[in-house]
Amino acid sequence: MSRRLPLFITLVILHAVALVTAHSQTFYFNDGRKVSLSEVRIKGANIVVSVKLAGTEGGSAELTLPISTLKRIDWPVPAAIAQAEDDLKADKPADALQKVNPLLSEQDPFREVSGSWWTQGAVVKAVALARLGKDVDADVMLELMRRAKADPDAIARGEIAIIDQLVASGKADAAKTRLDKIQNTASDDASLAAIAITKGRIFERAGRTEDALLSYLRVPVYYASENGKMPAALLGAIRALHNLGDEPRAAATLETLTTRYPNSPEAAEAKR
């Protein structure tokens, strides 16, 4: 019994994993039909399904269904998404592009279908292009997202990346114009935190140090759970406090940054 139990448990686990995997790779059509990903191939704007013919030995036929008749798809999370996001965090936009481009090609036919990963990949590409200084290409990506009816918060993330690049390039007026257009469309905390940081940078460039500080501090006050945005906000606050001559608070904020986010690029920059 002691030898059979582990084997039985293993088989149960493998069966459960197989069921989950099968479910997560399924096409659901408007007519109620559902087909496993392994049973189809994509041909242009259609999904070609292999169908076994009853009463024949090994007989099969192909059924062609338009992608437009898809209701949703269950697709496993592509590893390329997380890998490309990690590249962006490490300030490696070119590497992020290399990882996300194949994913976008794969997901492109399903860009408007619920469950597709195209929008997430498109956001990564827009951000990467913006950070590489390719604002026009990033704008093209955002327009594709709009046509695909992407979530406004996803579009806002790409917009913010372009705006950040404009600020870094000294084009503060153009950055402010674009920022004013998206402030009322973003609703998620990540986008709102990013907007606060970007506004802080615009104020900083304009010499409005107190306004910059207040904008940076909105992140720890209102969006404290956004750990991905916190290092940039704290670094901006440190710069502002230095410029205001408030060295004790600057030192305390530096301690917070280096203690809570020791491996962040912002912590390394703050120590220089």
What name fits each language-model region?
Residues V20-A150, R157-A168, D173, T177-N184, ...:
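Compositionally biased alpha-helical segments
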Residues L97-Q98, D139, D173-K176, E210-L213, ...:
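Conserved positions within tetratricopeptide repeat
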Residues K229-A232, G236-R249:
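Extended alpha-helical scaffolding segments
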Residues L144-D153, A224, T256-A267:
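Extended low-complexity acidic/polar segments
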Residues F8-A18:
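Bacterial N-terminal signal peptides
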Residues I155, L192, K229-M230, A267:
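TPR alpha-solenoid repeat register
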Residues M1-L5:
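Positively charged n-region of N-terminal signal peptides that target proteins for export
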Residues Y216-V221, H242-P265:
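TPR/TPR-like (Sel1-like) alpha-helical repeat modules
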